Amino acid sequence: RAALGASESMRSKLAEYNDPRLSRAFITKLDKEKEGKAQAPGTPDTDVYAPSGTPEQGTSKYGTSLFMYSATAPTLLMSFHELKFLEAEALCRLGRDAKSALKEAVVAGLLNAENSFSISRKELGNTLLNPASAITEEEANSYFDNTVEATYTNEPLKTTMIQKYFALWGASGRSEEHTSELQ
């Protein structure tokens, strides 16, 4: 696991959408002087994020996703947010309004990610330095209303699929639903 690295492509996609997971999802590599890992900022940083396709090989070279430490998070066969994303996707493909289903999916996906982040914080204990504040339901709703809804209006299916991609990333440790999606 020491050869894993935080993804620059995921960081940049989360930043593009101003997604609240960005402030919680990544941690720096071990700071030996401070004896811990810090919550990584969402700004580009080659010491934290591995460049897509050209990472430098080595152990503990980059930061990692906080999801790596969510070992005791539940493994979901089918989560509520996945079900709502499937509904939103089907409605989009039928040319119908999917905004309500998409909002439920996005909010539930953010809160599920926060559950994994909280579990990871417990796993890391006080070795996680300056952790970012938790994603709240209010923040998740605001993210949808102020960011996602505008892109949904212009590109409903694309927005649904991107938000689904974000929500399935790290979904409770290992996600059966994501494996199924890839097949």
Residue ranges and their predicted role:
Residues 1-87, 93, 99-163, 167, ...:
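Hydrophobic-face positions in mid-chain alpha helices that act as interaction patches
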Residues 177-183:
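Conserved small/polar residues in nucleotide/adenosyl-binding loops
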